[in-house]
């Protein structure tokens, strides 16, 4: 079990680009190499559809399943997939918990989670427990307890997960990662961070437009 001090140190590395050297922090369970990754999407709203478009443009992916409770968004996603000449994926959207059935499908290797924030930790934990690689939109958690849920579940399952935060790969952020790896800061006991982005229109939007 991680101590809080160990967690702080690991978080500095995780938050600044763990994907570049995963073996430095946690042992991972790996699947055999495949020519095409079977990928599913939970949440195909504005953000999820953007991720779907990116996956469609890759020839090393199979879009095997989508999940959303909004039929209109499902229809939009299916249309994009059809226009690319791909096979129709499995569709899950009977209720808010239908994503659990998606995660049980043998046709899913990895999942992109782009639902409302309050669902991120719950869905990511479920994916890791199902042995499904998870890419989760920010913010991945809302509380300290949820942060620990992600850490503990990863350590228990060894399943890959990644925060879909492109800022991690900015040059200044990568410079900090390099400093952590070279032990410039020594043992990290306390740090502060923040999100410099006005989110009032996102958190209190009208439900129709993505930014109010």
Outline where the language-model segments fall.
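N-terminal glycine-/serine-/threonine-rich beta1-alpha1-beta2 phosphate-ribose binding loop
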Residues: 1-136, 148-160
